[in-house]
Amino acid sequence: MSDYKRLSPNLAVAGQIQPGQLEDIARQGFHTVINNRPDNEGDDQPSSETLEQAARAAGLAYYHLPVTPGEISDTDILGFAGLMQQSRGPVLAFCRTGNRSSSLWALSESARTDPKTLIATADQAGYDLSKQEARLQQRWRAGPGAQPQPGHSAATTWDVLVVGGGAGGLAAAASLLKRRPSLSIA
């Protein structure tokens, strides 16, 4: 298994892994695996229970912290940060593509690390965290003492919501953008 991307000395992320890869993951020096995929998310996906059995047989600690794509809550961030703190040795976190795991890492580090650094690090690894930038900035401004609120989810916000995607809705969105190009419209 060599298709993981290192984000820090103690964390690498990857796309979906298979049970047969876990012995190789252990040989590469990882001590902990964090699975960020909900079970039954895809047809090609082994169950968390199957992965846990293979991880333990390979001598790895295994944690399942399922996160729905696009819905990372403050509780998820706290959970990921807690797992990183309690894990011994290098950690491999994975999801379908590695993007959720890299987002969880950046959000859990954002109170202590400048968002531009986090985004650049993820970008070098091939992950685009630009959609998380506002949330990263918010957590950075709040600082290390600020705690996420369990149950809170910083959903994406928009300046304008156009209801109806037909010709009228598209014309309204185009007209608004022509007048104010900086608007975010959904």
Where are each of the predicted segments found?
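A short, basic/flexible loop-to-alpha-helix module at the beginning of a structural domain
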Residues: 143-158
